[in-house]
Amino acid sequence: MFDPLHSGSVSVNAGSDNRTFSSVVLDRIEDSAADSLVFGNLGIRYYKHFYFAAAVKRELLNGLELSVGTKYHRRSIVGHRTEEAVDARLKDVYRQLAPHVSIVWQPRMYYYVKEGRKVNIGSRMPRLSLDVEQGVGRLFASDGIYTRAEADVQYSLQMGGDARLYLRAGGGGFFHTDDVYFADYAFLRENNLPVERSDELGGVFQLLDSEWYNAAKKYFRLHATYESPFFVVQRLFPKARLVENERLYANVLIMSHLTPYSELGYGIGTPYVDAGFFVSAKNLKFHSVGYKITVSLFGD
């Protein structure tokens, strides 16, 4: 860490990510009829993803944070090539060098200073995040040129008493694409939990098939979670003290062939377990039902 009064830091990380597929598959998706689209029939070849990232982060103003760095992606095809399954344009290995800029702004941030270090507490204002990555082609054997731009807004609104409404909205896409690229988003991810949350079930999709996270050139998403300690259970069973909160969930995703994908859910929260039941619809038609449970070993 440097310049602790402005939360300065340098980060370096590397690792492997989920398997993904190339933009060639996105073209096949757009050419397919929405009602008959089956990922297993698209001849998808997946790529293993290794990445290296380095960034410098600093708070420019109170609540305004800037991160600048670069990312290196190496994607190698899984298994052996078969001409029936793989488009002739595809290579076995793709390398992509991409400068990266991220901005996070949350106005009226409350903070305190301890031992010369600024510690942010929180804000009652919305949190806005912007994330841009620029693929640089033909530099250090890098493949393809693209611009990925995304925005994410989160807001926690006190509704009176102990009730609270959590909102999240965002969107993004790939622009100025040249040749093959990989639609790997920063915010549209299975594990991208919101900062403004009270549990790990709201603000993300619970029943969405994993292939869809990389299946869009552009997307828009909207999430809402309403939380209250006095909703159904406490009214019907006043002595059910273990249930601290009840939650209603609504999630919407709009992208190619999903117009829209939606989820509705109901959940309960206890000191040790959060559980939710969800129903999903694809293009206004019933799709699936399911449930999710998260466990906290030590409670709050």
Segment roles from a protein language model:
Residues M1, A14, A54-R58, T70, ...:
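Residues on the lipid-exposed face of transmembrane beta-strands in outer-membrane beta-barrel proteins
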Residues D3-G8, N62-L66, S76, Q106-V113, ...:
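Repeated loop/turn-to-beta-strand initiation elements of outer-membrane beta-barrel proteins
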Residues S9-D27, D35-I44, G116-N120, R127-V232:
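C-terminal outer-membrane beta-barrel translocator/porin domains of Gram-negative envelope proteins
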Residues G15-F21, L61-G63, H73-I77, Q106-Y110, ...:
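Structural signature of outer-membrane beta-barrel domains
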Residues D17, S22-G161, R247-Y249:
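Transmembrane beta-strand segments of outer-membrane beta-barrel domains in Gram-negative
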Residues I29-A33, L97, R164, T225, ...:
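Outer-membrane beta-barrel transmembrane domain signature
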Residues Y46-F52, V93-P99, D143-A149, A216-A224, ...:
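Residues that define the transmembrane beta-barrel architecture of outer-membrane proteins
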Residues A169-G173, A186-L188, A240-R247, I268:
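Active/binding-pocket-proximal capping segment
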